[in-house]
From Swiss-Prot:
Native source species: Oryza sativa subsp. japonica
Extracellular side: 62-89, 146-176
Family that this chain belongs to: Belongs to the Casparian strip membrane proteins (CASP) family.
Keyword Nucleotide-binding: no
A GO cellular component annotation in the UniProt record: plasma membrane
Broad class of where this protein is predominantly found: membrane
UniProt-recorded name of the protein: CASP-like protein 1D1
Membrane-spanning intervals of the chain: 41-61, 90-110, 125-145, 177-197
Amino acid sequence: MATVDGTTAPSSGGKTATVALESGGGRYGGPAPAKCSGANLALRALLFAVSLSALVVLVTAKQTVMVPFVIRPPQFILAPVPAKYTHSPALIYLLAALCATCFYSLITAISSVRLLSSSACSAKTLFYLILLDVFYAAVMASATGTAGAVAWVGLKGNSHTRWNKICNVYGKFCRHIGSSTFLALIAAIVLVLLAFLNAYSLYRRSR
């Protein structure tokens, strides 16, 4: 009986250990599922805040100054001349890009909150997010480039084309345009980071 008990105990213990190792290997040995991390949600919340701030700053880019017009030397009159973001197609394009990005960031942030409560993000969801993030990053980069070119001409002018600088007169207007362009650049960088983060999550899932 002692011999039977001695041989039975190791057998059952080895069996239990084998089951435990098999369950542990299935849990820890396989590739970890691609979970929607909190970093994804944080970046999308940051994207929404930055794009919304850039949008508000751009919409409020308005200034009216009194500019002297010579009638007959030495007579002149002062007339109000406004400067608005709607006067430039490049700034209108920036406005449209910011509106689209702000809406996109809000929708994806809400979706990220829902995905955080689930067990894992599907590979299909990650793939679509990568495509959308890259697309909006390209849109924001192009809009930032066009707005930056207009802002630079307004700041420095261009003597070859005889475009005079206006920021020495419309200081407030130029500050708004410059700030909005800088925030739009940050939004484009955040979108690139999101694309890399989702691509890494998809890579981990495929391993």
